[in-house]
């Protein structure tokens, strides 16, 4: 069985009772979303037209009351059914937490929310892509995610320490506006060649190693400050100017 759980609170403002999300589901597998108010929605995995590539399927809900806590449960009887989860329409409600520990085959994770959510992906070893903004963790360690290629945790103001020492495959990193982040550990074999750390004040030692890593990987792109300076700079070295950002 695969399961993702979210605890939310609807809010007393315009659209404060609405939520939406996208799922990438294995072809023909069914996934149920129990919205927590007695309503259940079922989605089925499908491919994009004229392609073998899996398509995102949409799900959404409007709650009957504002200012009420609800538990959303996304689940399938098949352990490998849920491949991607993007909570892209959760910004109108307050997120209390997002629980991913029972979805071991998750490869793609996105979340745009507001609230108190902390990120725990220690039980998701197949993750390749994470875009999870404004997490409330003080420390994050992605040692359990060796396949991770792209990570964005922009706006995570509570974050102090980020451990990527086991993430050899990581190529893109977004830590924009992580104001308190100072400690960044990278793998000695890191393939990192694109980073955005504007308005993030890494300590000089870690910033120096970051720059060495980027230069070692030849073609690289960086946007950020220099040694804690808020001045934003953009550097492209050896990159094709037509490359899609």
Task: Please name every model-derived segment.
Residues 1-115, 123-125, 146, 188-190, ...:
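N-terminal capping/linker segments that flank leucine-rich repeat
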Residues 49-52, 129, 170, 192-194:
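A short local loop/turn or secondary-structure capping micro-motif enriched for an aromatic residue
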Residues 83-85, 107-111, 128-132, 149-153, ...:
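Conserved hydrophobic beta-strand positions in leucine-rich repeat
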Residues 91-96, 115-117, 136-138, 147, ...:
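Canonical position 11/12 of the leucine-rich repeat
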Residues 96-98, 109, 119-121, 130, ...:
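Canonical leucine-rich repeat
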Residues 103, 124-126, 135, 145-147, ...:
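Leucine-rich repeat
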Residues 111, 115-116, 126, 130, ...:
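Functionally constrained cores in energy, signaling, and assembly domains
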């Amino acid at each position: 069985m695969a399961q993702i759980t979210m605890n939310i609170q609807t809010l007393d403002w315009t659209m404060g009772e609405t939520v939406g999300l996208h799922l990438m589901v294995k072809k023909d597998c069914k996934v149920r979303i129990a919205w927590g108010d007695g309503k259940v929605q079922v989605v089925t995995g499908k491919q994009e037209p004229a392609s073998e590539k899996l398509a995102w399927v949409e799900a959404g809900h409007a709650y009957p009351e504002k200012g009420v806590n609800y538990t959303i449960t996304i689940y399938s009887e098949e352990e490998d059914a849920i491949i991607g989860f993007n909570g892209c329409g959760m910004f109108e409600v307050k997120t209390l937490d997002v629980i991913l520990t029972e979805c071991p085959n998750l490869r793609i994770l996105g979340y745009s929310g507001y609230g108190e959510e902390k990120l725990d992906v220690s039980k998701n070893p197949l993750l390749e892509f994470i875009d999870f903004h404004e997490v409330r963790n003080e420390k994050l360690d992605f040692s359990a995610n060796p396949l991770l290629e792209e990570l964005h945790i922009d706006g995570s103001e509570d974050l102090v320490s980020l451990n990527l020492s086991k993430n050899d495959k990581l190529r893109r990193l977004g830590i924009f506006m992580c104001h308190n982040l100072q400690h960044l550990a990278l793998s000695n074999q890191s393939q990192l060649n694109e980073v955005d750390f504007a308005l993030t004040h890494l300590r000089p030692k870690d910033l120096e190693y970051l720059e060495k890593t980027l230069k070692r990987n030849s073609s690289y792109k960086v946007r950020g400050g220099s040694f804690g300076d808020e001045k934003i700079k953009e550097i492209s070295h050896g990159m094709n100017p037509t490359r899609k950002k």
